[in-house]
Amino acid sequence: MTTPIIETGTPTDEELMAALQGGQDAALAPLIERWELGVKAFLLSLGVPSADVEDIAQEAFVRLYEKRASYRVGAAFKPWLLTLAGNLGRNRLRWRFRRREDSIQAMDASQPGGFHYADPLAQPASTLAEKANLAQSVRSAVEALPANLREAVVCVELEELSYNEAAQIMGCTAKAVETRLYRARQLLRTTCQKLFAKE
């Protein structure tokens, strides 16, 4: 006999995974609903072209279902899911690179499938426009980082994961995450100093 998914209140991700492991396939739907946007945002922040994000996110949830038995009940769910999604995203990026399909145009906001940010000219006040320009500059600086450094910034600074959780996702040690984050911050500091010196 299986236990019901929802006993009282809203089940945690970990409880839903335990239910999914116990044969309750209905536990997958709330996980997808909760995490679909977060997975897509994570993939975009890793540099996956927006044209590929939907497919990879769907594949991540298919893998979640297929690999549900490998999830250790009681372990943090977020790093486990982002590891699945990140691996799929990195595989797609490697595939694109090998096929020479990845180009500067994919990063160009004027091209379909590129990154799209808020138009700073659409802001009503000059201070909002300045903030939008600053945010765009920082975003561009982060995107210009080497992939392993950018991934450390995304995991620790944007996703607010611990070094250990980030290490699990990135497939390295917590010390390596710390080192990559240090190097990324150094590069970002230099880039931002150059930006502000121009103004």
What do these predicted regions represent?
Residues 2-5, 9-10, 99-131, 162:
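Internal acidic/polar
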Residues 3-4, 21-30, 40-59, 174, ...:
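Short, charged helix-capping/linker segments at alpha-helix termini
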Residues 21-22, 48-49, 61-76, 95-97:
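Sigma70-family region 2
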Residues 32-50, 67, 142, 187, ...:
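Amphipathic, Lys/Arg- and hydrophobic-enriched alpha-helical face
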Residues 52, 176, 183, 187:
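Residues in the helix-turn-helix
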Residues 66-73, 83-104, 131:
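Arg/Lys-rich amphipathic alpha helix in sigma70-family domain 2
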Residues 94-97, 150, 185-199:
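Short, Lys/Arg-enriched C-terminal cap helix and immediately downstream tail that follows
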Residues 139-176:
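Helix-turn-helix DNA-binding module
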